[in-house]
Amino acid sequence: MARIAGIDLPREKRIVVGLTYIFGIGNSLSRVILKKAGIDESIRVKDLNESQEAAIRKALEESAKVEGDLRSEIQLNIKRLMDIGCYRGLRHRRGLPVNGQRTRTNARTRKGGKKTVANKKKVTK
């Protein structure tokens, strides 16, 4: 199993798909990295040799932040928004949608589970 950027890539998948298992690498960036490394996209992960893995690691370091570095940068950006007190920072702080989505209905992913409000009891005679 090839281990790149601290992630074990699935052996049976093509390398262009396997690289997308790394946080921060999508389809297009995967293709760019393979082109820089000079590796064919159709090769399987199990067929990579050590020199090809090293070339991928080198191309990856040159091109993008991935995994832990990227996650920490995103967290720092969110923290900065909260510290400066801008609208997006307030939305993050309150746990509400940030990008202008509606909140009257939906928004359950961001707000969490439904909070049920009890109705008033009807008095029976």
UniProtKB/Swiss-Prot annotation:
Key word Cell division present: no
SUPFAM superfamilies given in the database record: S13-like H2TH domain
HAMAP family the record matches: Ribosomal_uS13
PANTHER family: 30S RIBOSOMAL PROTEIN S13/40S RIBOSOMAL PROTEIN S18 (PTHR10871), SMALL RIBOSOMAL SUBUNIT PROTEIN US13M (PTHR10871:SF1)
Family the entry assigns: Belongs to the universal ribosomal protein uS13 family.
Subunit structure of this chain's protein: Part of the 30S ribosomal subunit. Forms a loose heterodimer with protein S19. Forms two bridges to the 50S subunit in the 70S ribosome.
Name of the protein: Small ribosomal subunit protein uS13
Source organism phylogeny: Bacteria, Pseudomonadati, Spirochaetota, Spirochaetia, Leptospirales
Gene that encodes the chain: rpsM
